[in-house]
Amino acid sequence: RCVQTAHFMKEARGKLPEDAADNDNFRVLRYVAKITINPAIAHGVAHVIGSVEAGKMADLVLWAPEFFGAKPKMIIKGGVINYTVMGDPNASLPTCQPLMYRRSFGALGGANGQTCATFVSKTSFNNGIKERYGLEKQVIAVENCRAISKADMVRNSYAPVIQVNPETFAVTIDGVHLTVPPAKECKLNQMYFFS
């Protein structure tokens, strides 16, 4: 939905002022931040996950370019392949049909506990919740999730004045009346998902 929204807003509202004439890199980074680092900041776990940086968990999603935003090729959790597209597990080659999403090395056995984390309050962490409950996953205390605001969000800190007229339901942002027509098409839809 995030990629669909990014495309729809570009069609409805035009290019962002920060984007170059020949690309939408800022828009892409902005919408990627909405589903990666910004939720991590809001939930107090950005010191561990949410971006690719030294010292953080190696959580990555790899995409074939033609399926970006729709169907990931591989999900790497804690530096180990956790979920991937694989063929028949009894076959001698990994690409034998039918290709399906399957759990991989990082999601099996004891690896799951080593590549994942359970986030708890600092009080729970200090009271030894991991030992008390016998948890196998890493237990990490959340940090700074009460004193954050929109200004702390990455590439999404704009906080306009939003007003809704109670009689006409007209929405204005910074005094500008906004209307967006219904979508006529949605990217990454039926072409990628059969139902």
Where are the language model's segments positioned?
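Non-catalytic terminal accessory/regulatory regions of metabolic enzymes
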Residues: 67-70, 86-171, 176-195
